[in-house]
Amino acid sequence: MIYTETSLPGVHFIDMEPIEDSRGFFSRFWCSNEMQTQGLPFEIAQINASLNVNAGTVRGLHYQRDPHAEAKIVSCTSGSVFDVAVDVRPDSATYLNWLGVELTADSNRLLYIPAGFAHGYQALADNTKLLYLVSEPYAPGAEDGLRFDDPAVGIVWPLDVTSVSVKDTEWPLVTGVT
């Protein structure tokens, strides 16, 4: 596996290194020892899956506050997605900076998003599926989020937003983030 830090410090690409033959390929998807070696300690507490029926669907931006802040490793298993991480740590030099990357089912690329970052995505194709590993169990009392269209963050979604949950439209604007 190849680990590369992105332009947003703390967020990393994890590229699988498939071993291919006439049957297809084999690749490690997760390795605790390698994560430790890379300085990215991560214990899997939960694994989530999502199906996004229509292109343009947006989910997020979600995170959990301390002491339940969570890191995620995101993989697109079908279709393609514009995956976004936003730094929500108020004391960070990159506070409210965001990174958007395309993940596809064929890329063998994962995205590591550390604790202290909000996560969201837009499906770029119909029937897009994601699988993500999460370092903390869901804690309803620690749940928080940013609006996907918050002008202070300024995310440029590649497609028109065709669907978003009511809950995700009701997150406070950045001025309400603590």
List where the protein language model places each region.
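Conserved metal-binding segment of the jelly-roll/cupin
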Residues: 103-125
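Non-catalytic, conserved peripheral segments adjacent to functional cores
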Residues: 1-106, 127, 132-178
